[in-house]
Amino acid sequence: MKFALFSVLVVLLIATFVAADECPRICTADYRPVCGTPSGGRRSANRTFGNQCSLNAHNCLNKGDTYDKLHDGECK
C-alpha cells in the first residue's frame, strides 16, 4: 500500500514538472494590448501584443526573440 501511494506521488510530481515546462499555446481573444520592447538590447522596433498571455507565449516559443513589457496599451 505504501509503495502504491509513493508511486502515485512520484507520477504526480513528474507530471507537474513536465506541465510547468510547456509554453502557453492558447490565449484568450480578449484584446488588452501590451507594448513589448526587445529584450537584451536588440535593435528592433517595439511590438504590440494582443494581451499579456500572447507576449508570454511568444517569449516561451521564441527564446532568441523575446520582448519585455514596456507598458499597457498599443505601442506608439
From Swiss-Prot:
Any Gene Ontology CC annotation: extracellular region
Q: Which residues form the Kazal-like domain?
A: 21-76
Cystine pairings recorded for this chain: C23-C60, C27-C53, C35-C75
Database matches in SUPFAM superfamilies: Kazal-type serine protease inhibitors
Using the UniProt record, give the first listed, main subcellular location: secreted
- Keywords associated with the record: Calcium channel impairing toxin, Disulfide bond, Ion channel impairing toxin, Secreted, Signal, Toxin, Vasoactive, Vasodilator, Voltage-gated calcium channel impairing toxin
Q: Where can this protein be found?
A: Secreted
Q: Which InterPro entries match?
A: Kazal_dom, Kazal_dom_sf
- Protein's UniProt keywords contain DNA-binding: no
Q: Which domain of life is it from?
A: Eukaryota
Q: Where does the record locate the signal sequence feature?
A: 1-20
BP-aspect Gene Ontology terms: negative regulation of smooth muscle contraction; vasodilation
**Alphabetized GO MF terms:** calcium channel inhibitor activity; toxin activity; voltage-gated calcium channel activity
Tissue/organ expression: Expressed by the salivary gland.
What function does the entry list?
Answer: Vasodilator protein that inhibits vasoconstriction of isolated rat femoral artery induced by phenylephrine. Since platelet aggregation and vasoconstriction are key hemostatic responses, particularly in small wounds, this protein likely participates in the antihemostatic responses during blood feeding. Blocks L-type calcium channels (Cav1/CACNA1) in left ventricular myocytes isolated from rat hearts.
Listed name of the protein: Vasotab
Species name: Hybomitra bimaculata (Horse fly)
